[in-house]
Amino acid sequence: MSLRLRVLLVLLFLLLFVGAPLAPAPAHAQSAETAAVITELKPGRGRVEVKAAGGDWKPARPLLALRAGDMVRASDDAKTAVLLSGGRGTMRIEGPNGVFTVPAAAAAGQGQRARALVEASLGFLAGTTRESSQAVLATRSATRPPIIVSPRNGRVLPEPLAFEWLGSRFSHYTVRLVGPAGPVVDRREVTGARWSYPADAPPLTAGTRYTLQVVAGSQPAQEAWFEVVDAERAREVASDLAGLEQELGPAVSPTSRAVLRAGLLAREGFLHDARRVVVAGLAADRDEPTLHQLLGDIYTRTGLTDLAAESFDEASYLLSK
């Protein structure tokens, strides 16, 4: 792991777990390190519950931070995955009688870097998702304009870009990409709500803000901007993700791996790329509430309150069915 990555992770750890003025933590959370996080949660016909030392059993929730001594149990066919800090992998707890007590985090040393990496990537989302799920109040409409979903007002990695908006796969749209000097690409009669940047189009310049415009019929044009980062920054992000993968090891499930990758990307401001990771995770694990919760969190950050509400509703449904 590079020195730059180690410094970044330590700083993130301090910001997230010492100075972040986000959702208030329980009393025992304020005086103890995070030793694990719930990254997968499927109640099925049973229940997944957690109990802090000296506390009562309570329903578990996605991305719940756990401390040493906390207990997790699963009944009937319920199951959950708990990611341990310090590069210690995951524990799977399954019903009907699965019980697990969270062990203490590893001592400082070689494990310290892994602990900072895991807690930085997950802790950022874990601290805000609870606020988001309670704060979203959206008015859903049967007829939606082609609101741009992604990328939406943020930085993106210089990979093949695909733009998405709210719409029908049978409808036709006008898609226009505008740069500082004027239109870069103008396409009419684009079918469906997804458009990939053409390989033969002019290359996008790093550090330049572009605006995507999508028009459906006589409705007003919908706009969102994005900025492609330069090659050096992209290499740094790729190195961070590779370091994350190395610390997780092969035993961590694809779903938990997606949660960690999305958390790290979102913490660095790459919400478009974080969303791609979550959407890919959902394609393989559609019934995982944690992924829907993360997707709702990303939509909240980008101002898409209707989509956030739908994602949070789906997470709640999967936890209660």
Which residues does each predicted region cover?
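Flexible, surface-exposed loop/linker segments and immediately adjacent secondary-structure boundaries
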Residues: 29-166, 224, 236-241, 260, ...
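Long, contiguous interaction/recruitment modules in multidomain scaffold/adaptor proteins
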Residues: 102, 131-251
